[in-house]
Amino acid sequence: MKSALLKQHFLNPVGMKRIDSPSYRATCRSDTCSDVIRMTVTVDGDGVVRDIGTEVYGCGYSIAGASLFNSAALGIPVEDVAAIVDRQLAAVLPEVPEGNRRCVELPKKAFSTIYESYRSEKNR
């Protein structure tokens, strides 16, 4: 891995776990390889991500991307997670081989399902 940040997240991943009683959960499979991510998130009454866990069945780039995502999302309002993660991804994606970029972005795809569930529940 060329990115020092992604390498750090791969070697010392953050949030690689399953939350037993999450507020939301999503499973996402890559459309280009066999990587799978299962994400569980606990959101408090104010809409803040209080805990996030990700199980990754895939390559090192998926693991690093999930760890980066988890560390960026923790303690952030659900509504703001995508923008914050986008800024972090923009900084590292140029150093990721073209064929692995979707692996790094896979956690964001899983979180989009969680976000839609959150918005749907909030608008009831």
Feature map (PLM): residue ranges:
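Domain-level signature for proteins that mediate thiol-based redox and metal-cofactor handling
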Residues: 1-124
